[in-house]
């Protein structure tokens, strides 16, 4: 299971069970370079901020990595400390091959155990395939929705870029890209995005790192994030940093809007007022025009999923010819 802080495991591998219930079922969890181990093991109530463990009471935890000796230049008094049964301070690049050899030696001494593992592999493969099939079904459910549904947008981007040597910079479109795309190389994704006003800058940095490699860097760009620093587009144009910017434009600071809805429910106040200070509408920013004003390619806004693919192809053609960012403003549903 990959928690997405960097790309650790191919998404299409039959043993990738991310988003399954394996944590709830496991009798042993091996953690590899997981800084916040507590988070994946609990369920969070977003109103009360209370957590409840989802793991079995008899589940053992082994942690391999350097998290315990991590030093921050400012502070390290954050995140919940997770109790573990065994911690091994080691570089996982060194430890995993050695652990693999040890497992092979143990299996060579016990043929029955190897058969059990093969049977378990087949079971996990079926679970993986069912997960992927379920996500594909979600794409079809709201295929014609306007604005564009997130699964549909992830699908449309994938159909255009899958034959390119691509890199996804930060935002994963609420993880729909991880469920629908084939992340098959470590450089495909440096890790999940951070908070608002960071993503356009991080994406530009990723694009700069890959400049000259022939790779197509894709930034799925939230509208609220770009509102904080649209001038970054000018940097991309000025310094000729090629990047495909596909807007995740739900015309809202919806993460906070959603939180205000939850708080209204808790406090018994009017949920209809949750939009105050949260909508990016009336009027909606014209991101295509903003992009053009910064010296980039701009197209949109697009609310029809059928028009996304052709627009992306035009943008990619511009990127390959001019070597500068291209912005396609796709308007999406909130979630």
Model region roles, listed by residue range:
Residues 2-124, 312:
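Glycine-rich, acidic loop regions that bind phosphate or pyrophosphate groups
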Residues 4, 33-35, 65-67, 87, ...:
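Anionic group-transfer/hydrolysis microenvironments
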Residues 14, 20-25, 96, 176-334:
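Thiamine diphosphate
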Residues 16, 82, 86-89, 114, ...:
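Hydrophobic alpha-helical scaffolding
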Residues 28-30, 166-167, 216-218:
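Structural motif
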Residues 120-130, 330-335:
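A short, charged, Gly/Pro-tolerant segment at domain boundaries
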Residues 125-211:
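Active-site diphosphate/adenylate-binding microenvironment
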């Amino acid at each position: 299971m990959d928690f997405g802080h960097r790309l650790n495991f191919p998404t299409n591998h039959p043993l990738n069970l991310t988003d399954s219930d394996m944590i709830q079922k496991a009798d042993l969890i091996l953690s590899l370079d997981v800084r916040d181990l507590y988070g994946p093991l609990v369920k969070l109530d977003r109103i009360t901020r209370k957590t409840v463990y989802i793991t079995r009471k008899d589940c053992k935890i082994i942690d391999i990595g350097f998290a315990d000796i991590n030093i921050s230049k400012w502070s390290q008094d954050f995140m919940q400390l997770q109790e573990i049964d065994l911690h091994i301070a080691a570089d996982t690049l060194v430890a995993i091959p050695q652990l693999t050899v040890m497992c092979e030696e143990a299996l060579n001494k016990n043929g029955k155990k190897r058969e059990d593992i093969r049977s378990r592999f087949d079971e996990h493969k079926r679970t993986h395939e069912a997960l992927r099939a379920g996500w594909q079904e979600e794409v079809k459910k709201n295929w014609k929705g306007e604005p564009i549904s997130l699964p549909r947008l992830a699908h449309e981007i994938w159909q255009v870029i899958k034959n390119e040597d691509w890199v996804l910079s930060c935002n994963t479109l609420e993880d729909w890209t991880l469920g629908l795309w084939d992340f098959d190389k470590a450089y495909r994704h440096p890790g999940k995005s951070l908070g608002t006003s960071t993503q356009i800058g991080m994406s530009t940095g990723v694009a700069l790192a890959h400049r000259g490699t022939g790779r197509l860097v894709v930034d799925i760009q939230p509208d609220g994030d770009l509102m904080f620093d649209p001038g970054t587009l000018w940097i991309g144009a000025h310094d000729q940093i090629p990047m495909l910017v596909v807007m995740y434009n739900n015309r809202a600071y919806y993460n906070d809007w959603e939180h205000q809805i939850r708080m209204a429910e808790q406090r018994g106040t009017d949920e209809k007022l949750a939009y105050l200070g949260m909508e990016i509408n009336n009027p909606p920013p014209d991101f295509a025009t903003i992009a053009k004003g910064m010296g980039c390619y701009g197209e949109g806004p697009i609310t029809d999923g059928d028009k996304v693919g052709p627009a992306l192809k035009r943008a990619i053609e511009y990127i390959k010819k001019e070597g500068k960012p291209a912005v396609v403003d796709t308007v999406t549903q909130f979630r």
